[in-house]
Amino acid sequence: MKVGIISLGCAKNQVDTEVMQGILENSNYKMTDDYYDADIIIVNTCGFIDDAKEESVDHILEVAQLKETGKLKVLIVAGCLSQRYQESLKEEIPEIDAMIGTDTQDKITEVISSALKGNYISFYDRLNKIDEQLFLRQPYQPGPSAYIKIAEGCHNYCSYCAIPLIRGGYRSRTIEDIKIEANHFIEKGSKELTLIAQDTTNYGSDIYGKFSLDTLLDELATIPGDFWIRVLYAYPTRITDSLIEVINRHEKICSYLDIPLQHIDDDILTSMNRGGNKEQILNLIHNLRKNIPDITLRTSLIVGFPGETDEKYQNLISFMQEIEFDHAGIFKYSDEEDTQAYNFKDKVSEDVKEQRYQEAWEVQKEITRKKNEGLVGTEMRVLIEEALEDEPTTKVGRTEGHAPEVDGAVIIPDCEASSGDFINVEIVQALDYDLIGEMTNEFS
């Protein structure tokens, strides 16, 4: 039996996809990227915002058509959308043969067996321990970087976010189990471990009684080998002095931090139930740049939140221009059922949201371009990821200031290095988001 998996959404969802792929390969299923040739297709969905939900539904409908045009026998929907819309999704798309939620990847073979017999089945149990599944992971995409999910769920309950409803409360993995998985990836040749969770800085609070990301990083940095460790999804009020010290002390830990702030106006932050205020955020950024002078900072920002007046929006733009984040993701507020913000008044019109979204992107593009221009003439260490398909001698890589998938890249023509090699590159040209470089040394 041939199985295809379509993975949508965030890196955390990709890890879930890799768990299912590993379980299936271990059970002698053959994986395929040719969906017309697949007997079974799993769509691992995202249900975070409207655009993501629409993309997930579109993929499900496209796959459903393969029951007529391909050899498809079974369509399985997994992930956030199936967890959130357990009953209505099957009613609206009857071609779905089975559904599993965000915590039941270990049931995938049982689900397939039942669906092949013509029996509809679904699993939505909430697990407290998922480590055994994670050890079976198989990479969904080729490359030298691996995501390490250090926790599942969230208990921040931001007013606009449905993730706690979808993925449950915060559950940390143990340091021992994470270190075993990290060792596994390094032994298989990974050159970058990217730590992810809904909130990485809350790591350990549930099982160790205190924020323990600093301790985890200390342990991971002792693993032998030449590789990077990167931290994404840090909550601003939980970035401790100890965490900053650990990031600065270890050469393996990238001088990089992703801190989703969402906004800077104090009234909006309060409405978002974010915790913290503008003054605390400014002090944090000052502290980070003072103690890690070469740090790269990324953030995520939401425009068009209910109650965002022109003045409050301009506060956000002024903040972006003052702080000059190296990278930023800009998102339009999306009404999500069953969240506090869904019932808020003073909604911002779609036209105004779109206008603010476009303007904020332009502001950030100019900032990133200026930052990139400042790198021209410098020499940087680059991790090679892949070759361009139509130009195999042109390689694409990233510096420690570029997280996988979400930030820019370094393009290196006439380069003999291979995926997974670290090389030194002189930056010769700056683009809006990417850099052009020339290799200056033998690769390793």
Swiss-Prot record:
Gene Ontology biological process: tRNA modification
PROSITE patterns in alphabetical order: MTTASE_N, MTTASE_RADICAL, RADICAL_SAM, TRAM
Disulphide bridges, residue numbers: none
Cofactor(s), names only, from the UniProt record: [4Fe-4S] cluster
Coiled coil: none
Radical SAM core domain residues: 140-370
PANTHER family, A to Z: RIBOSOMAL PROTEIN S12 METHYLTHIOTRANSFERASE RIMO (PTHR43837), RIBOSOMAL PROTEIN US12 METHYLTHIOTRANSFERASE RIMO (PTHR43837:SF1)
Protein name: Ribosomal protein uS12 methylthiotransferase RimO
UniProt lineage: Bacteria, Bacillati, Bacillota, Clostridia, Natranaerobiales
Gene: rimO
